[in-house]
Every structure is written in C-alpha cells, then in structure tokens.
C-alpha cells in the first residue's frame, strides 16, 4: 500500500499540472517517494502529467535524480506517441467530414482537450459512433487513412476496432452509444436516436469533432 503522504503528494502534483499558475511550496522527493509516485502514475495512466509537475515544482533528492531522468524520458516518449495519435485522429475526423459521414466523437479526445496539455493525458483509444448505414463508406475512409480492422474483430460487430500500424492510433467504431445487451442500453439508445443529425461540432486543430 502506498503511504498516505505519497498519495497526497500525487494529488498535489496533479493539481499543479492542471493549474500551473498555482503557487506551491517546493517539495523534496526521495527515491522511495519517487517509486511510489511512479506506481500511482502508471496505475492511473497519468505519468506524463506527474512528471511534468515534478519537473516544475519539486526538489529531487540527489539520489533520486537519475531515476527521475529515466522516468522523464519514458514520459516524454509517451507524450510524443500520444501527439502522433492525436494528429492522426484529427486527420481521420477531417476525412470522415469530407466524405459526409456523420460521425459522432465521444469520450476520449473530447475530454482530453479540456486539459492544459492534452497529450500529457494519454489515451489508449478513441471512440466514434457511426450509423450502420455508413459502414461501407466509413470503412473506405479508415483504410485510406492507413487503418485496418483489428485482429479478431468483425467489421459488422457492435463495436469494431480499427488500428493504424504506423501511428499506433486505435479507434473503436460503435453502432450504438450504449451496449444493446446491457439492461438499460436499448432504452438509453432510444433517447439518442438520430443524434448524428443533432451533433454539435467542436472545432479543434482544423477538424470537427
């Protein structure tokens, strides 16, 4: 179990990343504390955010600096990979828009753009709802963007995952916003029937999300 003081430090560092202008007293971080922070960051998938805050507002113990340097390189690599996936997803959304496919983006990037440094909040995939009538046209757009159906997935499944072997982008294409097999899924989906005609476009990086 991670000690309470390290858990509190973890939360303080997240606050510092989210609000860089907030004043915070310098914190001394030992190798043991750094190990605890690494574990929590990996568990909650916020490693780049914590590393960013550590670099801005922490005083590392001399014997923790080497470990932090390795951790920082890993975090910056994750940010670079996420930035590449984000750009690929923006290009995909623009291509879907150009093909007049009414895709509805939800979760994923729409939440990450709320962060001050969105690509520091890494995401394993993105989610899109595309009406079944546009399956064939959408598949052509995905393929033109270098994406292919993930191994084991069926193009006609309720959720189909497309992957790009070059950028690492993974996109889950949903045929409904809520799983039909779930108890309340059908009822919830009825509330959002025709949502592709009522979607609100969020302009980001030249693409409509």
Predicted regions and their residues:
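Conserved NTP-donor binding/palm subdomain of two-metal-ion nucleotidyltransferases/polymerases, i.e.
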Residues: 1-124, 130-209
């Amino acid at each position: 179990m991670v000690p309470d003081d390290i858990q509190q430090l973890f939360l303080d560092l997240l606050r510092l990343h989210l609000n860089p202008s907030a004043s915070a007293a310098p914190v001394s971080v030992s190798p043991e504390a750094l190990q605890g922070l690494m574990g929590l960051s990996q568990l909650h998938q916020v490693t780049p955010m914590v590393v960013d805050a550590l670099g801005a507002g922490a005083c590392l113990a001399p014997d923790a600096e080497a470990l932090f340097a390795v951790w920082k390189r890993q975090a910056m690599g994750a940010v670079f990979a996420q930035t590449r996936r984000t750009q690929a997803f923006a290009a995909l959304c623009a291509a879907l828009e150009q093909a007049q496919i009414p895709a509805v983006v939800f979760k994923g990037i729409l939440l990450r753009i709320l962060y001050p440094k969105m690509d520091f909040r890494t995401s394993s995939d993105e989610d899109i709802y595309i009406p079944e009538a546009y399956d064939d046209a959408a598949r052509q757009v995905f393929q033109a963007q270098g994406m292919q159906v993930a191994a084991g997935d069926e193009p006609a499944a309720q959720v189909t995952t497309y992957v790009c072997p070059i950028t690492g982008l993974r996109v889950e294409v949903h045929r409904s916003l809520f799983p039909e097999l779930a108890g309340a899924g059908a009822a919830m989906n009825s509330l959002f029937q025709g949502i592709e005609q009522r979607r609100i476009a969020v302009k980001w990086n030249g693409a409509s999300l």
